[in-house]
């Protein structure tokens, strides 16, 4: 059984994730991504973008700003609805969401009865001011979601691209929520990244597209990221669980060490957002779609797919992590990341630091450097170097030895099976590229 403590230890030790401001004691709910973490995160983002935008001729990208006028959040309902009712336990000083407590059983932490404060509202949005003077007239918010930047640009994208319904707008960006309890490492944080797509459809086509995107998104995790299918499930929201903007919602949940939790939400937002902005900005025609063939004018319905990028990093680490017992009593920690998202694709390892092997190894390294992020390691025994690469998820290790000088071949070792094959140096690049493209994924091994 994988423990979240194992993942946290690996993440810091190997440079995936660090505590923010650690030298000053750290900042709760905020994390920095190290050399390997940023590569893993960017690789996941790249695969998502290819799958959502490049694979669909009717989906385009957008990068909206973090800061927007406060009217955007008034219209969206966040100013009124994006808050939690909280109570504090007077005995242990812990704070809880009011809907998470059974008052008849007392405090979930210390079991004290009748020690709660009166409920009070807790705003989940971060406020700031824009301009030289702090005043309510220039108060703005750090965005709590990326979706609204898409909705307020609906007309700009429609006019500039000449897209026709159905079409989608995708973006990746940071969002901020003043989380009451930031917990489970990078799963729930105050600063996070979302990968969202808003898909605009005719109301009569909502059900078909809603189902389409559910299946499309589930397949992304299994086929592209290589997540084990047994660790994924759908969970549909009940009526009282729906957000204020949603007509229907279904989550894709992943089985983390702390249980099944949402990794992506697929929502039927109806025409709530576009209608709200049409109403509040006083320009309703900006949010209408005119079908030139049928002559219909209507406000499109919206299907949202919202995936947490930072949560995806945690998911891939948990899913790939394994502690193996090998023959002879040896052990290894291995990250079986899909090669497409692994930080390093190949490690080049000269057997020794002499006799021309480092020079040849550098030449082999240069074969890949334009297309793949590579690692060069000449320190320690070859066995220890293999173990170091296993632990950070490098799928292929290439050893340059004395035979490499004589017959121009190298040894390629597969991370997952530890099997080795001898390959001509001139064929190495095409071999690795084919291996990455044809990799079956963790769930099929």
Curated annotation (Swiss-Prot):
Subcellular location(s) per record: Cytoplasm
Keyword field contains Aminoacyl-tRNA synthetase: yes
A Gene Ontology BP annotation from the UniProt entry: glycyl-tRNA aminoacylation
Signal peptide as annotated in the record: none
Pfam families in the cross-refs: HGTP_anticodon, tRNA-synt_2b
Any Gene Ontology CC annotation: cytoplasm
Superkingdom of this protein's organism: Bacteria
MF-aspect GO terms: ATP binding; glycine-tRNA ligase activity; protein dimerization activity
Binding sites annotated in the UniProt record for ATP: 177-179, 187-192, 262-263, 308-311
Binding site for substrate: 97, 145, 192-196, 304-308
Predominant subcellular localization, coarse grouping: cytoplasm
Catalysed transformations (reactions): tRNA(Gly) + glycine + ATP = glycyl-tRNA(Gly) + AMP + diphosphate
Family annotation (InterPro entries): aa-tRNA-synt_IIb (IPR002314), aa-tRNA-synth_II (IPR006195), aa-tRNA-synth_II/BPL/LPL (IPR045864), Anticodon-bd (IPR004154), Anticodon-bd_dom_sf (IPR036621), Gly-tRNA_synthase/POLG2 (IPR027031), Gly_tRNA_ligase_bac (IPR022961), GlyRS-like_core (IPR033731)
Record's keyword terms, sorted: Aminoacyl-tRNA synthetase, ATP-binding, Cytoplasm, Ligase, Nucleotide-binding, Protein biosynthesis
Keyword Isomerase: no
EC number: 6.1.1.14
Record function comment: Catalyzes the attachment of glycine to tRNA(Gly).
Complexes and interactors: Homodimer.
Family: Belongs to the class-II aminoacyl-tRNA synthetase family.
PANTHER family in UniProt: DNA POLYMERASE SUBUNIT GAMMA-2, MITOCHONDRIAL, GLYCYL-TRNA SYNTHETASE/DNA POLYMERASE SUBUNIT GAMMA-2
Protein's name according to its UniProt entry: Glycine--tRNA ligase
């Amino acid at each position: 059984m994988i423990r979240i403590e194992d993942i946290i230890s690996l993440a810091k030790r190997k440079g995936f994730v660090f505590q923010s401001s650690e030298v000053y004691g750290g900042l709760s709910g905020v994390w920095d991504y190290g050399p390997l973490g940023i590569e893993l995160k960017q690789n996941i983002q790249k695969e998502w973008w290819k799958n959502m935008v490049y694979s669909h001729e009717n989906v385009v990208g957008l990068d909206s700003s973090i800061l927007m006028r406060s009217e955007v959040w008034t219209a969206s309902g966040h100013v009124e609805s994006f808050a939690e009712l909280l109570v504090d336990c007077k005995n242990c000083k812990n704070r809880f969401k009011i809907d998470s407590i059974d008052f008849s059983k007392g405090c979930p932490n210390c079991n004290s009865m009748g020690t709660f404060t009166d409920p009070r509202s807790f705003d989940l949005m971060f406020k700031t001011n824009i301009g030289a003077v702090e005043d309510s007239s220039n108060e703005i918010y750090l965005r709590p979601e990326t979706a609204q930047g898409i909705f307020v640009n609906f007309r700009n994208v429609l006019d500039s691209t000449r897209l026709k319904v159905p079409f989608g707008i995708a973006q990746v960006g940071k969002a901020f929520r003043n989380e009451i309890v930031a917990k489970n490492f990078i799963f729930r944080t105050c600063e996070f990244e979302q990968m969202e797509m808003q898909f605009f459809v005719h109301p009569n086509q909502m059900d078909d597209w809603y189902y389409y995107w559910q299946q499309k998104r589930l397949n992304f995790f299994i086929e592209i990221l290589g997540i084990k299918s047994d660790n994924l499930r759908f969970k549909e929201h009940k009526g009282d669980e729906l957000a204020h903007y949603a007509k229907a919602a279904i989550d894709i949940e992943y089985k983390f060490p702390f249980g099944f939790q949402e990794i992506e939400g697929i929502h039927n937002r109806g025409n709530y957002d576009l209608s709200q902005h049409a109403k509040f900005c006083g320009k309703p025609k900006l949010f209408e779609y005119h079908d030139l063939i049928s002559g219909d004018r209507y406000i499109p319905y919206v299907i949202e797919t919202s995936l947490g990028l930072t949560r995806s990093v945690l998911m891939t680490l948990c899913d790939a992590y394994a502690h193996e017992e090998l023959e002879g009593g040896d052990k290894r920690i291995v990250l079986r990341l899909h090669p497409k998202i692994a930080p390093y694709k190949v490690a080049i390892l000269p057997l020794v630091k002499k006799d021309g092997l480092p020079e040849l190894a550098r030449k082999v390294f240069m074969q890949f450097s334009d297309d793949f992020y590579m690692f060069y390691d000449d320190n320690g025994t070859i066995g220890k170097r293999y173990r170091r690469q296993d632990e950070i998820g490098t799928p292929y290790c290439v050893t340059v030895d004395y035979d490499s000088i004589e017959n121009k071949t190298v040894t390629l070792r597969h991370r997952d099976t530890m099997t080795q094959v001898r390959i001509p140096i001139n064929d190495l690049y095409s071999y690795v590229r084919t291996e990455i493209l044809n990799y079956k994924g963790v769930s099929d091994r």
